[in-house]
UniProtKB/Swiss-Prot annotation:
It comes from the Bacteria. The gene is plsB. A motif (HXXXXD motif) lies at residues 308-313. The keyword Transferase applies. One of its GO terms (cellular component) is plasma membrane. The lineage of its organism: Bacteria, Pseudomonadati, Pseudomonadota, Gammaproteobacteria, Alteromonadales. It is an enzyme of class 2 (transferase). GO terms for biological process: CDP-diacylglycerol biosynthetic process; fatty acid metabolic process. This is Glycerol-3-phosphate acyltransferase. It is found in: Cell inner membrane. It comes from Shewanella amazonensis (strain ATCC BAA-1098 / SB2B). Belongs to the GPAT/DAPAT family. The HXXXXD motif is essential for acyltransferase activity and may constitute the binding site for the phosphate moiety of the glycerol-3-phosphate. It catalyses: sn-glycerol 3-phosphate + an acyl-CoA = a 1-acyl-sn-glycero-3-phosphate + CoA.
Length: 807
């Protein structure tokens, strides 16, 4: 009988099982790490430990992976399923040598030399009992519980106190066949593997626990000694005619207002609360792209998360997901409005640092904040901030606020050695609890000040909110971005590091636009967003169930056949299943009669559902534009279709932060998908299929409100080509209000003055709005926009314009 089958070992494992709760990273190793169940597998661990292997045994049984106690047998030769770099550490004396590790590796390499078809997967496994990074001023608790290589006595204490926070992390498998073919199979290679594995485990631990936590007061004193803050304090004293000591006290007050006070203990408590909260609120959280972010951390990147901002839940959701995905929750830039009791102190201990909405020319505050941000980057803490500056009230991305991006880029320019990488993050929900409040604010109600009563009120209303979605977009490494935009930026900055480069502002603006585009590139199409997309394009926000299911199936086919990007995600299931989910979430209403079943959006929810549609409208706006062209013209050449789409795309791109890199190829792929779905026929001459016109009409409805806006703007410019930008925004908004009232447009963004301001800015960039504007170009796009509208809508615009001129 082997040792692990003895009564003693089984008893120890049973006791440990009662004390330990294990979280697996990633949650599905087969899918996330591409493990091949048909190939032999060997686990590699850093240190031999009875308790670690017992914890691994419990998890492998649940995941369907081989047990670490099960020997690997190949052609009658048995080898251990687990190899450890280091032997056990005794209570006294030296740890065992790593000779067994080297012998096992040499044996495995020899098997590959003898059998050319053999390919064993080496899977590194890291175990953590708690994730405390330690502090710069180490405590007795840290000395007992936070050692990287504990003795068996310390390990017993760790299991007792930290067993409920046990993490088992699997890493991407290494092919021993590849190692043998590339590097040979002698003893030297076994030593090399050991060195590489040690580096891997050291980096992996840093990713899981993060850098050591600073003493807050010691950090303040260190920051106050920096040259930049000394200079700012002296200038503050001089400009306000106060003593430097008084200015220094003000700087300390600013630091105390701003700085986080991260507590690992609070994070562990919050993890339990948030697990309860998510299980009560959501039926699951869909995550895409976490592995690439783990790899960036592993490679030593300084990570800055830049998510979209839908809800106050965003602060909690991303940190929770990162924690469960084996990464350290970031330090989050939170608005000072959230610094209210008791949430403010808890947010601060959870890693939030607070920022004023406006610095108002306060040079000392600006200097303090910059130095604090530089310190976070220098110490290696990941950071998170919302580039929109506030929560979106319409479901679309807001125009970015560039302040934090500018400060981050300035930190890079001042000489951060490690690569600093922005990670765009798309956050989505089947239900956003603040949506009703957003629409009240858009209709003119004053925004309520955040308070503890709002929090209690929200918790009281907790219910079934469906699923949450966290998609990580394509990262942007800032050093590479700077080189792309300003190839010789290092040389220019080196000449005078204190001088703001002339190119910084346009580069920051370009960076902000790329961040927003890559957030939208990672959008998540869900049951709620797809159902709202279809029903809001129908006449009365209602369709026969079969028709709704077919339309959703069409949209699913478009998204899967012609992916918007590889970072976007599409919910699982078919049209029928997605409609069922919408009904279950009380987003859709089902009405049955003798003729069948009608699915509708209740009138009280119609405006709210535009929010969810807007989350993914950019995924469908070009397919919708193609459908509109086919419905209005019935027959069109492929070349004419390409020209029409290309004409409107710059405006769509600016408004919706779209990132289609090869527009003609994307349009051609969509045309082929339309043909395969039976919506249109032809090759060079494209014709709509009459029997499928209802599906095309519903799809065309997605871009309908957008085309109305463009028609308003270009009809105004057609009448007055040299109209001032402010006048264009004013008259566009007035005309939109009238058009919406007559034709029942209820989407809040249709009346959003900020959207018309954004469009007028882009029109100026494109040459439509200037003293030298090309009148023929303006009239051409006006005629095309008018030609894509229903005649009644077009007539309303023209009559209203004529009436204004008569007045």
């Amino acid at each position: 009988m082997s040792a692990h089958e003895s009564f003693w070992f089984k008893s120890l494992r049973w006791i440990q099982k009662q004390l330990v709760h294990t979280i697996v990273v990633p949650q599905d190793p087969f899918a996330d790490l591409n493990l091949d169940p048909s190939r032999p597998l060997v686990y590699v661990m850093k240190t031999e430990s009875v308790s670690d292997i017992a914890a691994l045994h419990e998890i492998t049984g649940k995941l369907g992976l081989p047990s670490p106690y099960q020997m690997l047998e190949i052609d009658g030769i048995k080898t251990p399923r687990v190899v450890c770099l280091e032997g056990r550490k005794p209570l006294f004396g030296k740890r065992d040598s790593n000779e067994p590790f080297l012998q096992t590796f040499q044996q495995l390499l020899a098997l590959h030399r003898q059998q050319q078809e053999l390919d064993i997967q080496l899977v590194p496994v890291s175990l953590y009992w708690g994730r405390t990074p330690g502090k710069e001023d180490d405590t007795m608790r840290a000395a007992v519980l936070e050692r990287e290589d504990p003795t068996w006595l310390r390990k017993c204490l760790m299991i007792l106190f930290l067993g409920r926070h046990n993490f088992v992390q699997f890493s991407r498998a290494v092919s021993l066949r590849h190692m043998a073919d590339e590097h040979g199979t002698d003893k030297r290679i076994a030593h090399k593997l050991a060195r590489v594995a040690r580096v891997h485990f050291r980096r992996q631990r840093k990713v899981m626990t993060g850098p050591v936590l600073p003493n807050r007061q010691a950090m303040f004193h260190a920051l106050l000694k920096s040259d930049n803050l000394k200079k700012a304090i002296a200038e503050e004293a001089s400009s306000k005619k106060i003593s430097e000591e008084k200015a220094r006290e003000t700087a300390i007050q600013y630091l105390d207002e701003i700085a986080a006070d991260y507590s690992d203990s609070l994070v562990r408590i919050a993890e339990r609360f948030l697990t309860w909260l998510w299980n009560k609120l959501y039926k699951g959280i869909s995550i895409k792209g976490a592995e690439q972010i783990r790899q960036l951390h592993h490679d030593g990147h300084e990570i800055v998360y830049v998510p979209c901002h839908r809800s106050h839940m965003d602060y909690l959701l991303l940190s929770y997901i990162l924690y469960y995905e084996g990464m350290v929750p970031p330090h989050i830039a939170a608005g000072i409005n959230l610094n209210f009791w008791p949430a403010g102190p808890m947010f601060r201990r959870g890693g939030a640092f607070f920022i004023r909405r406006s610095f108002n020319g306060n040079k000392l505050y600006t200097a303090v904040f910059r130095e604090y941000l530089d310190q976070l980057f220098a110490k290696g803490y990941s950071v998170e901030y919302f580039t929109e500056g506030g929560r979106s009230r319409t479901g679309r991305l807001l125009a970015p606020k560039t302040g934090m991006l500018a400060m981050t880029l300035s930190s890079v320019i001042r000489g951060i050695e490690r690569p600093v990488t922005l990670v765009p993050v798309y956050l989505g929900y089947d239900h956003v609890m603040e949506v009703a409040t957003y629409h009240k604010e858009l209709s003119g109600k004053k925004k309520e000040k955040e308070s503890v009563w709002q929090v209690f009120g929200a918790i009281r209303k907790l219910g079934n909110f469906g699923r949450g979605y966290v998609n990580f977009g394509q990262p942007i490494t800032l050093q590479n971005f700077l080189t792309e935009k300003v190839p010789n930026w290092r040389e220019e900055v080196g000449e005078d590091p204190e001088q703001k480069p002339s190119w910084l502002t346009p580069v920051v603006n370009a960076l902000a636009n790329r961040v927003m585009t890559r957030i939208n590139d990672a959008a998540a199409a869900s049951s709620v967003t797809l159902s709202s997309m279809v029903l809001l394009a129908s006449e009365q926000n209602a369709l026969e169930r079969n028709q709704l299911e077919r339309q959703i199936d069409l949209y699913l086919s478009l998204l899967k056949s012609v992916p918007y990007t590889s970072y976007a995600s599409v919910t699982e299931g078919c049209g029928k299943e997605l409609v069922d989910r919408g009904i279950e979430l009380n987003k859709l209403t089902e009405t049955k009669d003798d003729l069948g079943t009608i699915i509708s959006i209740d009138d009280s929810l119609a405006i709210s559902m535009t929010y969810y549609r807007n989350n993914i409208i950019h995924l469908f706006v070009i397919p919708s534009l193609i459908a509109t062209v086919m419905v209005r013209h019935e027959e069109v050449s492929r070349e004419e279709l390409q020209e029409l789409v290309a004409e409107f795309y710059p405006l769509l791109k600016a408004e919706l932060f779209m990132g289609v890199t090869d527009l003609p190829a994307y349009v051609d792929a969509l045309v082929e998908c339309f043909k395969s779905e039976g919506l249109i026929t032809g090759d060079n001459r494209l014709k709509l299929v009459d029997d499928r016109i209802n599906q095309l009409l519903l799809l065309a409805g997605v871009v309908g409100e957008t085309l109305k806006r463009y028609a308003i703007i270009f009809n105004l410019l057609g009448e007055q080509p040299r109209m001032e930008r402010a006048d264009l925004e004013h008259h566009s908004h007035r005309l939109a209000s009238r058009l919406g009232a007559i034709h029942g447009v209820m989407a809040p963004e249709f009346y959003d003055k900020k959207l018309y301001a954004l469009l007028s800015s882009k029109l100026k960039d494109l040459g439509y709005l200037s003293d030298k504007a090309d009148g023929d170009k303006v009239r051409k796009i006006r005629d095309h926009a008018n030609g894509l509208l229903r005649s009644s809508v077009r007539q309303t615009i023209i009559e209203t314009l004529n009436q204004e001129q008569d007045d």
